[in-house]
């Protein structure tokens, strides 16, 4: 994939992270349902769902920028406890969204990445979203 595309995707993620209202509407009503992830969980706590998405965004943005994201990066950046981060990452692993791989430079460290299947679906979704945003911008420019 072109680096430019990953940069644009990471910028879209940054915007979504900063705009919680858009994030909650789009992802809770569209993307979660589209992947049937929410239905796999016995409890659909709003706080858990938001934290899951914050972790997914953080990992995805890091992956798109070529960064190696660890559990400690997650809990330090998102301001949650280490145990909460570990539990959420484990649940997201069980759902097939995240996976842990050993860091090639430091075998003691686990790097958190999006699974291939989820990454492909997420990239498709972000690309569709980018296309929709472009259409909105283009239609406003014509006026």
Model-derived segments and spans:
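N-terminal helix-turn-helix DNA-binding core of bacterial DNA-binding proteins
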Residues: 39-80
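Canonical helix-turn-helix DNA-binding module
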Residues: 66-110
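Amphipathic alpha-helical dimerization/coiled-coil segments
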Residues: 123-143
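N-proximal short alpha-helices
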Residues: 25-28, 47, 58, 65-66, ...
């Amino acid at each position: 994939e072109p680096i430019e595309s990953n940069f644009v995707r990471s910028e879209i993620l940054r915007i979504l992270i900063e705009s919680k209202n858009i994030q909650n509407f789009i992802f809770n009503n569209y993307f979660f349902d589209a992947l049937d992830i929410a239905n796999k969980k016995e409890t659909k706590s709003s706080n858990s769902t938001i934290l899951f998405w914050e972790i997914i965004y953080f990992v995805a943005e890091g992956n798109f920028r070529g960064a190696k994201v660890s559990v400690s990066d997650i809990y330090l950046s998102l301001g949650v406890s280490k145990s909460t981060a570990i539990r959420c990452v484990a649940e997201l692993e069980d759902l097939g969204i995240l996976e842990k791989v050993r860091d090639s430079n430091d075998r003691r460290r686990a790097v958190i990445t999006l699974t291939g299947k989820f990454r492909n679906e997420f990239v498709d979704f972000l690309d569709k979203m980018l296309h929709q945003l472009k259409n909105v911008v283009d239609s406003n420019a014509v006026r």
